[in-house]
């Protein structure tokens, strides 16, 4: 069925994904982006509709094809987000803010607010987005990204990896506790925050790199987080999460409940 959910892929190895069929394009007026750099990047490369509004099937197909995300994990996290943030009548979800492109509101208790909706998919203490309390929980924050770079230089030798993730996750929680009187880190945010921390070094590193004691370079991190852009000639990773030492764990991907923040 055109636009329907594709079956689990037979091939789950690395392959070129920044290809001629998926060129990066700059945002057009009205295009929607949100707190998730992974989905933002997939939309800017045409794996998702470039306007940022998609069906759950399109999102699942995109993250499986573009990032080699575990199929069962992709189904779980996408429908989890769609049930709370999407329009179940039109079967459309905004990867950013509320928009009439998803159709008319159906009334309470439905939110239909898109992934920007606070304390559902999106949450406090993001690595590169400000807390909801401060007014913008979805736009790239250069100050926070500078801290991301600082911690990557200090603890990762210029790369973002598992070691950096632990230090930075603790720092962002401490910052939110100290500055945000409405700080909320209850479920599901407790789980998505730590999944968010692991996604960049698992899926934003070229899949042809079989030994990766370094992790995600700052040049490529800037492309994904700020520009929603894959590096030139980028190959997706092997199926499953990549650990700090470069060993693939095919059973870990279902635990990734977010595509990075």
Swiss-Prot record:
This is Aromatic peroxygenase. One of its GO terms (molecular function) is peroxidase activity. Aromatic peroxidase that oxidizes aryl alcohols into the corresponding aldehydes and then into the corresponding benzoic acids. Catalyzes the regioselective peroxide-dependent hydroxylation of naphthalene to 1-naphthol and to a far lesser extent 2-naphthol via a naphthalene 1,2-oxide intermediate. Halogenates phenol to 2-bromophenol and 4-bromophenol. Oxidizes the sulfur-containing heterocycle dibenzothiophene to yield sulfoxidation products, and trace amounts of ring-hydroxylation products. The gene is APO. Heme binds at residue 36. Binds 1 heme b (iron(II)-protoporphyrin IX) group. Belongs to the chloroperoxidase family. It comes from Coprinellus radians (Coprophilous mushroom). Pfam families: Peroxidase_2 (PF01328).
